[in-house]
């Protein structure tokens, strides 16, 4: 009978333990990643409740043991082995009250932990030899105690080490979870020796020793080691929290300063000054499916800086939770209605007040508000305009929802300041808000005027004339929304200075505007190659580049390609990849694009063709221009023309020079994603003979081409279709015999020669200051 009762009690104990474990959070995954300076990160994922662990470190054997209270383990594989110089194995086990992770190390180590979302990050370093571990008293093993004494012994914990391996839940259910204080150098004892630890020996460990958690060892992952990591290690991560907020984590090891944070419409721009991001680490995350205010996260390089661009949607607010140097956390929260501002918000309301029940018949509203004030603990002040009676019957409703129902029924609204709530008709509160804002505006308009000089560094002061809508006749704020009615702006072109006279708030707005606009403009190096090619060379060039790919059908995407962006020309019915889309010589195929990866091969092909006398490079100019500034290249000569003018009965003759040049005008426009939109104008002028009546006069033959195309950084825009044709007659004869009349024709050979050439222009823009765009001369 006693045996059956014991089994029943044991079964109930196991079931209760399993129920408690199931109700808590579970460890679902363990991942290990590496950081510079031989540091490891063990990322422990939870399904719901997150527990910050408590643990200890041993040096012989080298182990780190971490306990997660009220946590279970939901992993198929609970022993993970690694071929790593520091971490060798991770073992996971659980009992009725907690889960334990044992990290087996190849050498003594130290750790610290950090909670990040639904994960606990464990940072592991090698032990610092300069920090000596505190001495820990050793406890000798005692004779094994009977099972009854073990069951009666209280469950005690030690903060130094454990002399037993972590046993599964079934074994723990039969015996209390006991821990003993042992020497740091003592190896883990078998399970049978653990059960021999008596209650006296557990109690013999002084309270100070039990409470002496190795805080020094846990904190021994110093900030110096993290800061000593090589620079330029940058990464981003995104997750969603329980408040439907987007959490963006930016790790920028080697950056010790503070980021510059600015907001432009629906973009949050975080700039790390003088922190260079490798091109391979640039990335963009589309996170719109997470249903947070964050739609997209982009990490990119801008000159010598690193920019994090957060694209948002809807109403939001930014919270900077950054703490450690080099690690930044930004929380983008959905913006809800603020009781102090009284703004309108159509989002569903969340009520968290204590539930109450109300049942009234024709009761004064002021009485209901008084009851709600007592239930909520808030101080409610009702306006004299709040009156009338209501019939109300509510059961188990949060008090704040009951208050909201009362206000909606009587068109009331509230403003909250601390724990004082002011309730009045909505129109009355809106009138008060308007009066308050008008009073603030009047005070600002009547405030003292100040003058501030802003000397621009990069922009021309005349550019701000159009931005601020200023002119010489009217420099007051009558035509400007930024300047107040009493303010004024003066422009000094000699010193490139803006002189602003206005209130402090307006001057501060000017300061922010100038900081955003007065920045160095990006520069573009435009390299043009003007080539005169024999007829058919463009077709040969397209065939050679197309032959580098594989023949493929239209629906087959396995062929390798150089990556041509686009082209205008014939369609290959077999789907051959032409890397430069110049397969035909028709004028319709006069524009093509070559991606940056193919530009090097294109230059080699042009050099080879020139050595074979198939092409001739007429000019190869390079010009550096700023973004959105026109660059002009001309090559040619001026032709004198005689102009006769008749005036007042007399005539005068003047000589004018007209340009006959090969001109190229390019205006680059850099897009936010690093592409370049080029507006190109090409004119080819040459002298020609024109018939005018019975006379032949000198004229200029003109050919123009205007286009606009988008090219990637380092790509090449090819413009062709400008042809020149020379027709000539040849005469070959035998000396003397060919000069005899009539008979001489037998000794002559006449022929016609047609030389047709195509003018090809290759334009390659490169954004200066970006990786991989160094020019070679």
UniProtKB/Swiss-Prot annotation:
Region span, Disordered: 135-156, 197-236
GO process annotations (BP): establishment of competence for transformation; protein secretion
Keywords: Cell outer membrane, Competence, Membrane, Protein transport, Signal, Transport
Membrane protein topology class: Peripheral membrane protein
Highest taxon above the source species: Bacteria
UniProt xrefs under InterPro entries: AMIN_dom, GspD/PilQ, NolW-like, NolW-like_sf, Pilus_4_PilQ, Secretin/TonB_short_N, T2SS/T3SS_dom, T2SS_GspD_CS
Coiled-coil ranges per UniProt: none
SMART domains according to UniProt: STN
Main localization (coarse): membrane
Cellular component annotations (GO), alphabetically ordered: cell outer membrane
Cellular compartments annotated: Cell outer membrane
Extent of Low complexity compositional bias: 135-154, 197-233
Family matches, as Gene3D superfamilies: 2.60.40.3470, 2.60.40.3500, 3.30.1370.120, 3.30.1370.130
Position of the signal peptide: 1-24
Homology family: Belongs to the bacterial secretin family. PilQ subfamily.
Function: Required for type IV pilus biogenesis and competence. Could function as a pore for exit of the pilus but also as a channel for entry of heme and antimicrobial agents and uptake of transforming DNA.
Subunit structure of this chain's protein: Homododecamer. Tetramer of trimer.
Entry protein name: Type IV pilus biogenesis and competence protein PilQ
Lineage: Bacteria, Pseudomonadati, Pseudomonadota, Betaproteobacteria, Neisseriales
